[in-house]
């Protein structure tokens, strides 16, 4: 068959050196996350399909956990897990699938809906990246690519089928997926379908996490037309549906209702009736805790999440150094539906994103340029049910639109015979958000620069300066109505949202330096040794947080009001009366990352270390949601070359005692041991079969990751069988 340079480039990026390599491929190249097809492009950290099959992870965050300073946030439910990169997560990390942004974000719920079976590879950029992707990239970028027929066809075959069955013991997870694919000189097509079904999750020492069962199913269709050597078009459509019964806050273990909190208040004010007095916290301490618990109210709900995306790509790659063009048109739609189990109250959040990306690169004699324009329009529609019982005090539904236009430029300037490489970049974004009554608009300039010094053929240094920003989300702009409330002691206690017209975007300024040593044939012919060390410091200004407080007209002395009971001063308040999104924190995130790998024809040894410290620059107080430092060591060995490989990894998570003053919990250290094996012959009668086995948390440790609200997964045996023909 005859494929264009573009098609061949896509196919060759899949080649990996080791069937079970857990370490990052530091010298592989791809253009999804970096948006840069030039030969000087920055290399992101990458997880190949081979590595993903070996790990059998159930979420993107779990698949990336062995990368220094990339951790899991969101608890043990796979749907709620999100990557935490250098202390930042959620809507401070940009998610990209097939070159298209995924903007759905609802607090304490999932936003990574692509199943692992539909992921061909994952790339990670750590650190601010708004010069590439605009708003939101304070912590970094996670970019995923789904497969096409050219990825799966072997040996110039024109037709193929791939069948996979996976099983995991921790939650009786069954994963089934089937792909059918074909290609000729002009056309290629892929159709994939999957079905995943899991029971409640088992944690360490045999405990069960209630309400963690789920089902997920869906599919992917891709069509490609190679018009000629210079022109190619692709059309893809992806659709998934996720179902579970869980607390509306997917990050907590069990539901917490208004009624439960009200019972606690009544118990606190219950008279002794002649009994010996019990030790109680002060009323100030008690109601401070009540405020926190009301902010975490979460009812058990039936949840459904339909998610779909349609993308049209056009590639123009003539034999012209000035033209290497990519145009993408896309439409994403995500709907999050919830219905409370007891009362039947329904909620719905629907986000539709339409956009276009245009990118071109030009190679001049002494300079390389990448430049482009992005436009996207987000439309959000929400519904919030109410009743006179468990849903009396709810946030109001809101409908809003957002338009964002970004223009960016990346340059690579080699100097002194390419011993130095200067790579400045800049992006300008203009955005506006509007509802029926309010409209906001703003703009932001995001510069970045990188200087690489190739000292010798085995040593190079890189220094970076990157800026990023995150515009306030539509929820932060437009949420209104009641945050929480209750009827207690003969009165309604209601906390209401207050709009903030002066809300500013979050901004980040990151400095980092990296040293990279790499040797070939160091100890024996053909071996490779790599070691990389990075130090970074990211100063984030105007963090947006939800502030809960009393207004100036309200008596903040809850003691007097509580003591008065039903006859309390009507201007008093047991609970804070206002909630508002405010810019309240200037933070500094700093840390180090170390990676080392030694590889021979059959043996791979690797180790990595990551540590992030976060503090409020004004008060010096520790920040929340900073993962514990971790160090991992591992080995892979091909017992039978090109056929059977075994491996092991041991990871030590340090204790996390750096927590905010009002966070009463610290987290002890723990060690996890994982084993794995892969049977994947490259030739012979079983060359179409691949078997992966993994045993995670070998010693069934009971542990709780830092700032997680639930325990981690216990011993988990995983097996996966793939057969292709």
Curated annotation (Swiss-Prot):
Signal peptide range: 1-21
**Which positions does the motif TonB C-terminal box occupy?**
708-725
Query: Which superkingdom does the taxonomy of this entry point to?
Result: Bacteria
Q: Which Pfam families match?
A: Plug, TonB_dep_Rec_b-barrel
Broad class of where this protein is predominantly found: membrane
Q: Which GO terms describe its molecular function?
A: heme transmembrane transporter activity; siderophore uptake transmembrane transporter activity
Quote the SUPFAM superfamilies the UniProt record gives: Porins (SSF56935)
Membrane topology term reads: Multi-pass membrane protein
One GO cellular component term of this record is:
cell outer membrane
Where found?
A: Cell outer membrane
Annotated coiled-coil positions are: none
> Which keywords does the record carry?
Cell outer membrane, Membrane, Signal, TonB box, Transmembrane, Transmembrane beta strand, Transport
Q: Which InterPro entries match?
A: Plug_dom, Plug_dom_sf, TonB-dep_rcpt-like, TonB-dep_rcpt_b-brl, TonB_haem/Hb_rcpt, TonB_Hb/transfer/lactofer_rcpt, TonB_rcpt_b-brl_sf, TonB_rcpt_CS
Keyword Phosphoprotein present in the record's keywords: the answer is: no
Task: Give all residue intervals belonging to the TBDR beta-barrel domain.
Answer: 158-725
Residues annotated as domain TBDR plug: 36-147
Family of the protein in this entry: Belongs to the TonB-dependent receptor family.
What function does this protein fulfil?
Answer: Required for utilization of free heme at low concentrations.
Its recorded name reads: Heme/hemopexin utilization protein C
């Amino acid at each position: 068959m005859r494929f264009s340079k573009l098609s061949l480039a896509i196919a060759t990026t899949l080649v990996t050196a080791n069937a079970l390599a857990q370490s990052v491929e530091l010298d592989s190249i791809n253009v999804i996350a970096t948006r840069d097809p030039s030969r000087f492009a920055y290399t992101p950290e990458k997880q190949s399909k081979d590595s993903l099959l070996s790990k059998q992870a159930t979420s993107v965050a779990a698949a990336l956990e062995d990368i220094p300073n990339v951790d899991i946030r969101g608890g043990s439910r796979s749907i709620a897990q999100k990557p935490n990169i250098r202390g930042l997560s959620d809507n401070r990390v940009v998610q990209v699938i097939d070159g298209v942004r995924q903007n759905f974000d609802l607090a304490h719920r999932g936003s990574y809906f692509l199943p692992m079976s539909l992921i061909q590879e994952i790339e990670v950029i750590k650190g601010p990246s708004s010069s590439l992707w605009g708003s939101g990239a304070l912590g970094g970028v996670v970019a995923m690519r789904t497969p096409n027929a050219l990825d799966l066809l072997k040996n110039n075959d024109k037709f193929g089928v791939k069948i996979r069955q996976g099983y995991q013991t921790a939650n009786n997870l069954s994963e089934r997926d089937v792909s059918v694919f074909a290609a000729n000189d002009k056309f290629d097509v892929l159709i994939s379908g999957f079905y995943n079904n899991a029971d409640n999750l088992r944690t360490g020492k045999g405990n069960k996490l209630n309400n963690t069962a789920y089902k997920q199913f869906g599919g992917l269709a891709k069509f490609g037309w190679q018009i000629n050597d210079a022109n190619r078009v692709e059309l893809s459509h992806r659709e998934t549906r996720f179902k579970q019964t869980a607390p509306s806050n997917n990050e907590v273990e069990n539901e917490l209702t208004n009624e439960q909190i009200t019972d606690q208040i009544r118990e606190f004010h219950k008279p002794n009736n002649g009994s010996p007095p019990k030790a109680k916290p002060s009323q100030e301490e008690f109601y401070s805790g009540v405020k926190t618990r009301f902010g975490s109210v979460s009812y058990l709900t039936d949840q459904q999440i339909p998610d779909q995306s349609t993308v049209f790509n056009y590639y123009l790659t003539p034999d012209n150094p000035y033209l290497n063009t990519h145009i993408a048109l896309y439409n994403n739609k995500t709907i999050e539906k919830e219905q409370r189990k007891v009362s039947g109250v329904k909620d719905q959040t629907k986000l539709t994103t339409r956009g276009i990306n245009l990118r071109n690169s030009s190679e001049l004699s002494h300079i390389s340029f990448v430049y482009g324009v992005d436009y996207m329009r987000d439309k959000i529609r929400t519904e919030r049910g109410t009743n006179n019982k468990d849903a009396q005090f709810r946030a109001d539904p809101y409908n809003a639109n957002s338009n964002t236009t970004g223009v960016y430029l990346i340059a690579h300037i080699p100097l002194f015979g390419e011993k130095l490489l200067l790579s400045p970049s800049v992006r300008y974004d203009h955005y506006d958000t509007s509802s029926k009554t309010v409209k906001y608009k703003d703009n932001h300039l995001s510069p970045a620069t990188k200087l690489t010094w190739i000292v010798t053929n085995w040593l190079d240094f890189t220094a970076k300066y990157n800026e990023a920003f995150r515009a306030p989300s539509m929820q932060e702009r437009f949420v209104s109505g009641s945050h929480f409330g209750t009827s207690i002691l003969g009165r309604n206690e209601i906390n209401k949202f207050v709009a903030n017209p002066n809300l500013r975007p979050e901004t980040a300024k990151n400095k980092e330096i990296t040293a990279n040593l790499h040797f070939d044939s160091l100890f024996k012919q053909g071996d490779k040794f790599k070691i990389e060390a990075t130090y970074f410091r990211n100063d984030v200004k105007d963090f947006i947080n939800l502030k809960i407080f009393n207004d100036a007209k309200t008596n903040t002395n809850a003691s007097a009001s509580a003591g008065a009971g039903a006859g309390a001063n009507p201007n008093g308040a047991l609970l804070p009366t206002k909630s508002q999104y405010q810019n309240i924190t200037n933070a500094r995130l700093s840390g180090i990352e170390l990676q080392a790998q030694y590889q021979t024809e059959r043996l791979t040894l690797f180790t990595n270390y990551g540590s992030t410290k976060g503090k409020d620059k004004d008060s010096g107080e520790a920040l929340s949601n900073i993962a514990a430092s971790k160090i991992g060591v591992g080995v892979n060995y091909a017992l039978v070359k090109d056929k059977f490989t075994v491996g092991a990894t041991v990871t030590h998570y340090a204790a996390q005692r750096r927590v905010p003053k009002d966070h009463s919990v610290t987290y002890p250290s723990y060690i996890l041991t994982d084993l794995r094996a892969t049977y994947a012959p490259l030739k012979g009668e079983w060359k179409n079969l691949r078997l992966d086995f993994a045993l995670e948390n070998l010693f069934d440790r009971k542990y709780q990751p830092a700032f997680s609200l639930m325990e981690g997964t216990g011993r988990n045996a995983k097996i996966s069988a793939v057969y292709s023909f």
